[in-house]
Regions:
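Catalytic helix-loop patch of NAD(P)-dependent Rossmann-fold dehydrogenases
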Residues: 91-109, 118-123, 131-177, 185-188
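SDR active-site strand-loop-helix element
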Residues: 12, 36, 77-83, 124-130, ...
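C-terminal substrate-binding subdomain of Rossmann-fold SDR/epimerase-dehydratase oxidoreductases
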Residues: 28, 35-36, 201-326
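N-terminal Rossmann-fold cofactor-binding loop
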Residues: 36-41, 59
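Conserved internal alpha-helix within the Rossmann fold of NAD(P)-dependent oxidoreductases
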Residues: 62, 104-107, 233
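NAD(P)H-binding glycine-rich loop region in Rossmannoid oxidoreductase-like domains
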Residues: 59-99
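Rossmann-fold cofactor-recognition segment
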Residues: 49-61
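N-terminal Rossmann NAD(P)H-binding glycine-rich loop of SDR-like oxidoreductase domains
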Residues: 9-28
Length: 326
């Protein structure tokens, strides 16, 4: 991800998995990076020496958001803010609605107002999700695949995605979207199943835990490595591409695969003996088996995933030992 063009990048969701990697990558090329975080957020120590300007505020306050545009006059905005847990969206659909849909509506309005006031286009990159497509697709998912959302999270992200397309085609705003398939890293929060598995494997290998309780381990997903996907975002933004791009590996792996690899990396070969199935953890309307077709971004920008599924899990298990020293 190279620039050095004097761009000004405004990132919403800057302390999340994707936002943190994006802020780091952008800060290395000499551009200005403004990272918007919650008032209650604590900035990790490792960011202290990086060229990132952290701004606290409530992104659901449209006045605050527009004031950022007036103050910093960004060339790029990245919306990575998301209430991204599918299961939690059932428990708190209002939060999902406000963050995943209404904030996007407000952000588009702010960008449009800024353009009318200053005659300056701001490139907006919206992070969309493969959850929009539902569980019944038999073929590789392309950018044109029909949406069939099956959860509050998926429904709100689908509506937000369509808002972006409408604003681009009707109002001429410079908006790109990345349709992200599942992607993990050591920075995934612990409430996500990938971290639950890598943390569990590490703790079991150290004799601290006796079992790992999971839902349906036969679920299959198209999993990639988060920094690879963030690199795709940078390529799209650098070229100001007002278009939609699937970012995926095109390969399916199961939760059982993830468990086997994680336990092997941790030095535990009989992993099946430590797994406990809890049917209460089975997700309704599970989006299993979706594969993404990333040929569009590969052909246009030369992007392809670098880190393999096995390498990703290895990185995550090794990171558990550093984060949770015993």
């Amino acid at each position: 991800m190279t620039s050095g063009q004097g761009y000004r990048h405004l990132i919403f969701g800057a302390l999340g998995q994707d936002g943190s990697y994006l802020a780091e990558q952008l800060s290395t090329n000499g551009d200005q990076v403004i990272a918007v975080i919650r008032n209650s957020s604590v900035v990790p120590k490792e960011y202290s020496n990086k060229n990132i300007n952290f701004i606290r505020g409530n992104i659901l306050d449209g006045g605050f958001v527009y004031s950022l545009l007036e103050r910093y006059k960004p060339t790029h905005i990245y919306n990575l803010a998301s209430a991204s847990s599918v299961s939690e969206s059932y428990l708190n659909p209002e939060q999902s609605l406000q963050v995943n849909l209404e904030f996007v509506r407000s952000l588009i309005d702010c960008v449009d107002r800024f353009r009318m006031a200053h005659g300056q286009d701001i490139f907006l990159l919206q992070a969309s999700t493969s959850e929009m497509f539902g569980p019944d697709h038999q073929n590789l998912i392309t950018e044109e695949a029909i949406h069939d959302p099956r959860s509050p999270y998926a429904e709100h992200k689908s509506l937000a995605h369509n808002l972006c397309i409408q604003a681009r085609t009707t109002n001429g705003l410079k908006i790109g979207t990345v349709i992200l398939f599942n992607h993990e890293s050591p920075r995934r929060p612990l409430n996500f199943v990938s971290r639950k598995i890598t943390r569990g494997a590490y703790l079991i290998s150290q004799g601290v835990r006796k079992e790992l309780v999971l839902g349906n381990i036969n679920v299959q997903r198209d999993w990639g490595y988060a920094p690879d996907y963030v690199h795709a975002m940078g390529l799209i933004a650098t070229d100001f591409l007002s278009d939609d791009f699937v970012v995926a590996t095109g390969q399916l792996r199961s939760l059982d695969d993830m468990c086997r690899i994680a336990f092997k990396v941790a030095g535990v070969l009989d992993y099946e003996n430590y797994l406990v199935s809890d049917k209460s953890l089975f997700r309704p309307n599970e989006n299993s088996g979706l594969k993404g077709d990333a040929s569009k971004i590969r052909d246009k920008l030369g992007w392809k995933p670098i880190v393999t599924f096995e390498q990703m899990i290895e990185k995550m298990v090794f990171a558990e030992g550093k984060e949770s020293p015993l």
